[in-house]
């Protein structure tokens, strides 16, 4: 009997010893987007460390808004602020802009947009949509990464009048490939975005 109780005690103590090691460890932050052109990280206030290959990057903090370019990313120490931040790691895969044969103007520049920065890798725009004011029909000659800053809904309409409504929220990230034509209209709430065109 004593031997059985002793054996159970050993098993119980072993379980206590193993349990802490069995808890999930802090996993590496996974990218929100990863393709041949970019790796995009969404950071919260609680995590400022990412696994990066030390490429150039664009840093976007949502609040207070900061847009900055770094020739080499750091893999730690990002200040995500209270609302979070986005790091766009730029891979060594440049793609020349498409020749625009659509008959529509390029997506940028256009009214409502402010150029935040430009270099040989990116062109970054700060754009605000206005209720009741559709954008001109336009052509995207470059791949873009879009980071939305406000809650709202945008209706996107193609030249053949096909429409879709997208609900947007702060921190939402989208990668949109080039070779697209459409117009956009704010149909609900507000909408502002930092739009990074990839060269």
Give residue spans per PLM region.
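Ligand-binding loop in jelly-roll beta-barrel domains
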Residues: 55-57, 72-93, 151, 177-199
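Short acidic-glycine-tyrosine-enriched beta hairpin
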Residues: 61-74, 161-179
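Bacterial N-terminal signal peptides
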Residues: 7-17
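Boundary at the C-terminal end of the N-terminal hydrophobic targeting segment
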Residues: 20-24
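N-terminal targeting signals for Sec/Tat export/insertion, comprising classic cleavable signal peptides
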Residues: 29-54
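Positively charged n-region of N-terminal signal peptides that target proteins for export
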Residues: 1-4
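Surface-exposed beta-loop interaction hotspot
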Residues: 79-124
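Glycine- and acidic-residue-biased ligand/ion/polar-headgroup-sensing regions
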Residues: 49-67, 140-160
